[in-house]
């Protein structure tokens, strides 16, 4: 959702709490608003390869809660489904467990709470006028979950199609979870770490 992030970078906002698998890097993704010091807290599962985030973390300018990726997606899903919390063995007995309620079932587990959002900013390949969405490839990982976990979902799409152009069995997010749609532009597909045979 690069165009949405560009718009956020131009707005007079601060103290944002973001929920994202990563913060981005190389001038793309949420790093655009990170370097403007607009993010107060971030929930994410990967922070590697981002020197700007590293600097702010070490300077205690941003609070980061690292969440194991499976737990991360389940916390988002729990918010969308109205689940008040769940126990998982992932992270039990580690730094992740600090300050969390623990219980033993078949093995030690920790209580994880849902991750709710005021806004979800997601990108889909296609949307129809009713807000039904279709995602391309890995964009389908977290986007449907975030659409359900947020009070307001803003969707940037590459292609606006007519109602019925997305077959019902191919709808990844139903329009009931979508409040705003716009067609974006100027998309690039950068490669974060290029590896070729022989290296």
Segments (PLM) and residue ranges:
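Conserved alpha/beta enzyme-core scaffold
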Residues: 1-199
